[in-house]
From Swiss-Prot:
It comes from the Eukaryota. This is Pyridoxal phosphate homeostasis protein. One of its GO terms (cellular component) is cytoplasm. Coiled coil: none annotated. The gene is prosc. The keyword Ribosomal protein does not apply. It holds the Pfam family Ala_racemase_N.
């Protein structure tokens, strides 16, 4: 249970980040930038507090933790979960069954696309058998490894066009998945010209041109606690902020 001072600190940190997002968005004429509060390893009590303050977009990195939290917070009907962690293909069925799952941001290859699509179609078949007609496409983002670091997940920049084409043209994928945009994790030691963010913008421009998709319909998820402001400057439509809102992480009970 959080004490009064902890609650005040959380709300103050959240409002500070929210204000900074608004200021930088206005400065560079960016509209409707989503602030995703990354709540991994943090208790659901903290999520409830921010939800009660009107926040809706929350990010989780671990499938089992997301499943547990989504069940515990199932009455929060307007919550929008962003999955931003590594996807194990054998857990795609569990992931796609999460209530109020808004987007999976970390799709990096065709195998994951196909697994997600198959899981969704199986879920749809089960829903139809149970007379549950609450079926809709799942938003997905293609994760691009713009920095080329071996420690990071994501497809190569030159591979993302082919993955988007597969999402849009494969029968199973186009019937169950909605291509929302691109995601990257910038190098924390990036130079001021932000080559990783520029690379993702270049990928977006190429996809728009090659596949005749309107530029403004392709979202960009880039920017975290340490670099969300330059990310917005470069065109991010969604920033993922965790420790700057919730405080440092405790990974001792990581799921």
């Amino acid at each position: 249970m959080m004490d009064e001072n902890d609650v005040k600190e959380l709300i103050s940190s959240y409002k500070n980040i929210k204000d900074r997002v608004e200021i930088i968005s206005n400065k560079f004429d960016r509209h409707n930038v989503k602030l995703v509060a990354v709540s991994k390893t943090k208790p659901t009590e903290m999520i409830r507090i921010l939800y009660d303050k009107g926040h809706r977009h929350f990010g989780e990195n671990y499938i089992q933790e997301l499943v547990s939290k989504s069940e515990e917070l199932s009455e929060l009907n307007e919550i929008k979960w962003h999955f931003i962690g590594s996807i194990q293909s054998n857990k795609s069925k569990i992931l796609t069954s999460v209530k109020n799952l808004y987007v999976v941001e970390t799709v990096e290859n065709k195998k994951i696309l196909d697994k997600l699509a198959k899981s969704l179609l199986n879920n749809e078949e089960n829903n139809n058998n149970n007379n549950n007609n609450n079926n809709k496409k799942l938003n997905i983002m293609i994760q691009v490894n713009t920095s080329g670091e071996e420690s990071k997940s994501g497809c190569k920049p030159e591979e993302c066009l082919d993955l988007v084409k597969h999402c849009l043209e494969d029968n199973n994928c186009k019937n169950s998945l909605n291509f929302l945009g691109l995601m990257t994790i910038g190098n924390p030691n990036a130079t001021p010209d932000q080559p990783d963010f520029k690379c993702l913008v270049d990928c977006k421009n190429n996809i728009s041109k090659q596949l005749n998709i309107p530029l403004d319909s392709i979202e960009l998820s880039m920017g975290m606690s340490h670099d969300f402001e330059p990310a917005i400057e470069f065109g991010s439509t969604s920033v993922r902020v965790g420790s700057a809102i919730f405080g440092e992480r405790d990974y001792s009970n990581k799921k």
